[in-house]
Amino acid sequence: MADNDAIKVHDLRPAPGAKTAKTRVGRGEASKGKTAGRGTKGTKARYQVRAGFEGGQLPLQMRLPKLRGFKNPFRTEYQVVNLDKLSAHFPEGGEVTVDALVSKGLVRRGQPVKVLGTGEITAAVQVKANAFSASAVEKIQAAGGSTETL
């Protein structure tokens, strides 16, 4: 192939009709002039109504009920651990602390831990946690273990 037959980057151009200029409305009296494609008169010809405007109909945000009650800013969110998880991860029993639970991947660090009573436990465990449910304390003590609230 000869050098003069090769396509050069500066010779490339878009296909005819691929690039069209943005339509400028309201300039003169031709196609998109005068009313600029908005028809004649009325609200839509003069301005846009705000988003959510429904005419004379009661707006959606006023039709829906108000949010009632309140959120307690001092509520403590516990990470929960059930007894079936404790018996699976500590089958031989022993001391169960928050650090031990973190190292086994049962809870994350930085949030208080609450032990709940779902499941059964047979090994005697000494559990140290931030909170316990009554059923969890009952089952742990029945298995020969003890609980300590931090």
UniProtKB/Swiss-Prot annotation:
Gene3D superfamilies: 3.100.10.10. InterPro entries: Ribosomal_uL15, Ribosomal_uL15/eL18, Ribosomal_uL15/eL18_sf, Ribosomal_uL15_bac-type, Ribosomal_uL15_CS. Keywords: Ribonucleoprotein, Ribosomal protein, RNA-binding, rRNA-binding. Disulfide bonds: none annotated. Residues 1-44 are annotated as: Disordered. One of its GO terms (biological process) is translation. Coiled coil: none annotated. The keyword Lipoprotein does not apply. The keyword Ribosomal protein applies. One of its GO terms (cellular component) is cytosolic large ribosomal subunit. Residues 1-13 have a biased composition (Basic and acidic residues). It comes from the Bacteria. Part of the 50S ribosomal subunit. This is Large ribosomal subunit protein uL15. It comes from Micrococcus luteus (strain ATCC 4698 / DSM 20030 / JCM 1464 / CCM 169 / CCUG 5858 / IAM 1056 / NBRC 3333 / NCIMB 9278 / NCTC 2665 / VKM Ac-2230) (Micrococcus lysodeikticus). The gene is rplO.
